[in-house]
């Protein structure tokens, strides 16, 4: 019935937040939570402050012996992946409670008991078949993709499939909501 081809974006978020003080942990959790509720906007870069990074790196210095320091771009990417991973998990969990859901990925998550893990789907030989044979193909874009029509949407439509996508501003420019 429903298919997702792609990563689950399982991150090292809990590992990298473990040594942090409670304020920093809460602040990062707030960023992930807020970004997860916003479509059509990307908040993460503006919410990562120099003060936050300085405090995080002080906390890391207390436990790291290799001189590890978190950079702004690395933190931004980790938070974007964590947000996307949570969204994909939630969508798959909710849909799999009511429909047959297949995940084509090298990632697995034991918590998704009702999802059928199908393994890797080759872009040229297997993906077109998945897209054309599924009733609904999911597109849940990585949060760093701010604009543009995701390639996955074009892939699915090019194979004659039906795609259900997260909001991307450009989709409204080229498609009529509720009609196409």
Predicted regions span which residues?
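Catalytic binding pocket for nucleotide-activated donors in carbohydrate/polymer assembly enzymes
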Residues: 1, 82, 103-180
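Conserved, well-structured beta-alpha core segment at the onset of a catalytic domain
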Residues: 1-15, 123
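Short, flexible loop/turn elements at secondary-structure junctions
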Residues: 6-9, 99, 105, 142
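Extended, charge-rich helix/loop segments that form flexible
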Residues: 10-90, 94, 98-100
């Amino acid at each position: 019935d429903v298919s997702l081809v792609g990563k689950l974006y399982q991150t090292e978020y809990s590992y990298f937040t473990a040594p942090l003080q409670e304020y920093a942990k809460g602040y990062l959790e707030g960023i992930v939570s807020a970004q997860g509720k916003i479509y059509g906007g990307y908040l993460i870069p503006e919410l990562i402050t120099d003060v936050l990074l300085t405090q995080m790196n002080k906390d890391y210095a207390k436990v790291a012996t290799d001189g590890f320091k978190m950079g702004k771009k690395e933190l931004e990417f980790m938070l974007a992946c964590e947000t996307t991973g949570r969204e994909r998990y939630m969508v798959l969990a909710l849909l799999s409670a009511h429909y047959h859901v297949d995940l084509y990925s090298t990632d697995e998550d034991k918590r998704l008991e009702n999802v059928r893990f199908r393994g890797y789907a080759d872009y040229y030989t297997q993906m077109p078949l998945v897209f054309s044979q599924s009733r609904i193909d999911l597109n849940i874009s990585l949060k760093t993709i701010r604009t543009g029509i995701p390639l996955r949407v074009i892939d699915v439509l090019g194979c004659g499939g039906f795609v259900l996508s997260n909001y991307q501003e450009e989709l409204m420019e080229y498609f009529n909501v509720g009609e196409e």
